[in-house]
């Protein structure tokens, strides 16, 4: 699983990047078929950063979430939570499909 973090209109500290990477890696434990994770932080408005998270899984399944908050780590937490919900729903859908077959 490849994780990419990019920043627009600013930079992140090494500590912030490490914390974000640790939070995003948890998605891989939730759903093992993830191939690529891309997180983009837009710091154009420093008081309200925008966090955009895009996840690609096997068989061309893509998931995405965006959140704007007045706190960077709060926005990261929210966007990861949104993706966790999407992945749980998708995983449940797959499991139910295989049970009915």
Where are these regions (language model features)?
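N-terminal, polar/charged subdomain of small-to-medium soluble alpha/beta proteins
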Residues: 1-101
